[in-house]
C-alpha cells in the first residue's frame, strides 16, 4: 500500500511539473502583434480604411498543420521559419492575414498557386526580407505564385513576390475576373513569364498600385504589368522599373481586343516608370488597340523601345492623355524616343517632354527624337490648356502636316521642333500649329530694303536661322559662322561664344540668360549680331545686389557687336559694364533695340569702354536708358 501510494504521489508530481513547465513556456513567449501593414506604430489611415482592425495578434505557422479559421472565416498567421508547401494555402470565402516575418513561403507543387482562392488576402512582412515564390525553371515552369480568385481581393503591404518562373500570365500575381489587388508596399520582382505580365497580370480585374516596387520582371508583353479584356490599372505611387518585354510594353502593357473590351490605365501622383525595356515597342508603356491611358502625374524616364522608347500609342483606337507629368531621357532604335504617336494624344496643364533620343542599334548615331507624329497624326489640347512652362519637342513624319489640332491659344513656345532647321508657328485662323523656317534679314525684318549704314557692314540680308534651346552645342559652318534663333526662353549654364567666330542671334521675343553669374552670357566672339523679329526679346535678367553677376555681354579685344533689336537689360553687377563690356579696340554699333535697367557699383551701367581703347560706341538708333553706375550709362 505504501509503495502504491508513493508511486501515485510521484506520478502526480511529475504530471504537475509538466503542467507547470507548459504554462511557464506559454506565458513568457512573446506574442506576434502589430498592424496588418507590418508596423507596430502605424498611424497611416489612408492605407487602412478598407480594412477594419489595425492591431492583430498572429498565430505561428510552420506549414506542418492546417490553418485554423475562426467563426468569421478569418485567420492570422506568421511564419516561424522558411516554409515549403505541398498544397496551396486557401479556403473558400475566407480572409487570411499573413506576416512573412522575414521568411520564405514557397511550394513544391508547381501545378497550383502558392496562395489561391481566398476572399481576402493581406500580406505584410514586419522584418523586411520575407518572400513568396522562388519556384519554377525555364525547363519546369510553375504557374503564378498568387492567384486572386474571381470577386476576391488581395492587399500587399510588405514582403517580396519574387523569383517565380511560369508559362502563364502573371508570374508573380494573377488577378482574376472582377478581382482587385491593392499594393501599398513591398516588391514584385524577378518573376518571369512566357506570356503577358511578368510581375502582375489581369484580365477583367483591377490592379491598384499605391506604393511599392515592381522591378526586374520579364514577359513576352508587359514585363512589369499587363492588363487586358476590360481590365484596369490604377497607379498613384511607387515605381515600375527595370522590367523587360520581348514584345510590347517593357513596363506596362495595355491591350483591349475590341471596343467592348477596352482597357484603362490611370497613372498619377509621384509614380516612376523608369529603366524598362522592350525588344518590340513601348519601352515604358505599350498599348495595342482599344486602350485608354491617362497620365496625370509622375515621370516616365530612361526606358528603351524599338518604337516608342517611353510610350507607344499603337493605333487609332489607342487614347492617351498627358498632364502634369514628365517624359525624359528615353531612347528608341526606331521612331519616338518619348512617344510613338499613331493614335490619339491629348496634352494639358504642365507637360515636359524633352531629352529623348533616337539611338542607332550600334550606338554610334544619336539624334533628338521626342514625340514622333506618325503620318498625319497630331496632338490635341485638353480643356485645361497647356501651361506656359510646358516643353514638348516633336518630330514629324510629314513636315507639311499640322502638329496639333485646334488649340485656343498660341503654344509655339511650348511645342518645339526636334529638327533645328524648323520652328513651330501658330495659325490664328485654323488655330493649329505647324512647322516653318525662321527666315529674315539680319536686322529682324522680313521685308527689309534698307541699304543704309548697318547693312553694308555685313554681307547677308536673308538669313535662315536654326533653333537654339540651350541643350545642344551651336554648329558653326566652314566660315566659323552660325545663325541661331530662340524657340523659347533659354537659361544657359555656360557662356555662348567661340574664339574668332561670328554669331547671329535672333531673340525671337524670348529671354536669354545664364545661371552662371561668374561668366558672361555671351563672350569671346569676333562678331556678334543681335536682332529680335518679335520685339520683346531680352539678354540678361540676372544678378542681385546681394549676389551680383558679371557683365551680360563681354566683347573681346578688336571685336564688334551689332544690335538691331532686343533689349540688353536687368543685369546687376559689381564690375564695369553691367550690360556690355568692350575690350580694347572693340566697337558697339547700335541700330535699334535698347540697353536699359542695368546696374553696377563700378563704371558704365549700360556699356563700358576701355579708357585707352580706340574702339567705341556708335549709336545710330535705339535707346540707352535707366541704367545706374558710379559713372554714366556709357563710359
Task: Give residue ranges: language-model regions.
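Disordered low-complexity repeat/linker domains
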Residues: 40-42, 55-56, 63-73, 108-111, ...
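Intrinsic low-complexity tandem-repeat regions in disordered proteins
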Residues: 31-34, 39, 46-48, 54-58, ...
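Aromatic (phenylalanine/tyrosine) cluster motif
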Residues: 8-13, 61, 174, 248, ...
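Sec-dependent, cleavable N-terminal signal peptides
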Residues: 1-27
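Surface-exposed loop/turn motifs in large extracellular/passenger domains
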Residues: 89-97, 114-133, 141-165, 173-192, ...
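N-terminal extracellular ligand-recognition/capping segment immediately after the signal peptide
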Residues: 74-96, 100-109, 481-503, 507-513
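Extracellular/surface-exposed low-complexity segments
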Residues: 22-70, 74, 325, 348-481
Amino acid at each position: 500500500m505504501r509503495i502504491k501510494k508513493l508511486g501515485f504521489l510521484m506520478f502526480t508530481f511529475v504530471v504537475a511539473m509538466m503542467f507547470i513547465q507548459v504554462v511557464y513556456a506559454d506565458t513568457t513567449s512573446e506574442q506576434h502583434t502589430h498592424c496588418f501593414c507590418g508596423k507596430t506604430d502605424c498611424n497611416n489611415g489612408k492605407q487602412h480604411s478598407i480594412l477594419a482592425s489595425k492591431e492583430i495578434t498572429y498565430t505561428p505557422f510552420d506549414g506542418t498543420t492546417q490553418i485554423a479559421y475562426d467563426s468569421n472565416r478569418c485567420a492570422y498567421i506568421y511564419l516561424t521559419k522558411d516554409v515549403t508547401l505541398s498544397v496551396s494555402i486557401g479556403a473558400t470565402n475566407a480572409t487570411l492575414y499573413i506576416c512573412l516575418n522575414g521568411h520564405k513561403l514557397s511550394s513544391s507543387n508547381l501545378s497550383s498557386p502558392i496562395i489561391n482562392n481566398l476572399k481576402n488576402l493581406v500580406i505584410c512582412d514586419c522584418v523586411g526580407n520575407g518572400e513568396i515564390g522562388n519556384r519554377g525553371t525555364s525547363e519546369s515552369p510553375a504557374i503564378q505564385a498568387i492567384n486572386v480568385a474571381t470577386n476576391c481581393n488581395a492587399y500587399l503591404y510588405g514582403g517580396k513576390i519574387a523569383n517565380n518562373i511560369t508559362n502563364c500570365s502573371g508570374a508573380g500575381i494573377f488577378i482574376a475576373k472582377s478581382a482587385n489587388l491593392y499594393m501599398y508596399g513591398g516588391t514584385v520582382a524577378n518573376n518571369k513569364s512566357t506570356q503577358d505580365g511578368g510581375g502582375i497580370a489581369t484580365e477583367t480585374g483591377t490592379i491598384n498600385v499605391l506604393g511599392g516596387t515592381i522591378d526586374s520582371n520579364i514577359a513576352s508583353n508587359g514585363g512589369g504589368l499587363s492588363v487586358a479584356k476590360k481590365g484596369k490599372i490604377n497607379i498613384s505611387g511607387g515605381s515600375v522599373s527595370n522590367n523587360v518585354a520581348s514584345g510590347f510594353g517593357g513596363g506596362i502593357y495595355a491591350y483591349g481586343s475590341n471596343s467592348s473590351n477596352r482597357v484603362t490605365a490611370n497613372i498619377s501622383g509621384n509614380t516612376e516608370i523608369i529603366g524598362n525595356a522592350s525588344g518590340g515597342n513601348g519601352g515604358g508603356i505599350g498599348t495595342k488597340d482599344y486602350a485608354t491611358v491617362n497620365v496625370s502625374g509622375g515621370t516616365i524616364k530612361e526606358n528603351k523601345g524599338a518604337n516608342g522608347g517611353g510610350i507607344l500609342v499603337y493605333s487609332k483606337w489607342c487614347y492617351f492623355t498627358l498632364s502634369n507629368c514628365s517624359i525624359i531621357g528615353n531612347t528608341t532604335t526606331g521612331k519616338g524616343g518619348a512617344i510613338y504617336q499613331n493614335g490619339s494624344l491629348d496634352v494639358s496643364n504642365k507637360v515636359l517632354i524633352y531629352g529623348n533620343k533616337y539611338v542607332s542599334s550600334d550606338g554610334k548615331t544619336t539624334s533628338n527624337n521626342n514625340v514622333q507624329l506618325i503620318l498625319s497624326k497630331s496632338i490635341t489640347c485638353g480643356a485645361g490648356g497647356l501651361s506656359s512652362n510646358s516643353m514638348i519637342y516633336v518630330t514629324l513624319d510629314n513636315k507639311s502636316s499640322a502638329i496639333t489640332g485646334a488649340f485656343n491659344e498660341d503654344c509655339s513656345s511650348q511645342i518645339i521642333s526636334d529638327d533645328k532647321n524648323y520652328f513651330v508657328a501658330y495659325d490664328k485662323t485654323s488655330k493649329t500649329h505647324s512647322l516653318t523656317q525662321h527666315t529674315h534679314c539680319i536686322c529682324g525684318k522680313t521685308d527689309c530694303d534698307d541699304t543704309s549704314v548697318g547693312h553694308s557692314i555685313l554681307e547677308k540680308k536673308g538669313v535662315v536661322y536654326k533653333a537654339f534651346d540651350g541643350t545642344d552645342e551651336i554648329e558653326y559652318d566652314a566660315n566659323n559662322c552660325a545663325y541661331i534663333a530662340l524657340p523659347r526662353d533659354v537659361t544657359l549654364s555656360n557662356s555662348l561664344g567661340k574664339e574668332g567666330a561670328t554669331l547671329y542671334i535672333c531673340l525671337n521675343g524670348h529671354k536669354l540668360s545664364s545661371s552662371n553669374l561668374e561668366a558672361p552670357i555671351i563672350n569671346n566672339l569676333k562678331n556678334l549680331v543681335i536682332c529680335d523679329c518679335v520685339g520683346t526679346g531680352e539678354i540678361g535678367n540676372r544678378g542681385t545686389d546681394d549676389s551680383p553677376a558679371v557683365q551680360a555681354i563681354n566683347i573681346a579685344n578688336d571685336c564688334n557687336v551689332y544690335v538691331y533689336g532686343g533689349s540688353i537689360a536687368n543685369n546687376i553687377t559689381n564690375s564695369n559694364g553691367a550690360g556690355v563690356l568692350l575690350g580694347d579696340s572693340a566697337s558697339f554699333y547700335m541700330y535699334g533695340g535698347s540697353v536699359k535697367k542695368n546696374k553696377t557699383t563700378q563704371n558704365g551701367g549700360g556699356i563700358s569702354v576701355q579708357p585707352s581703347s580706340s574702339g567705341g560706341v556708335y549709336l545710330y538708333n535705339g535707346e540707352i536708358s535707366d541704367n545706374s553706375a558710379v559713372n554714366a550709362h556709357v563710359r
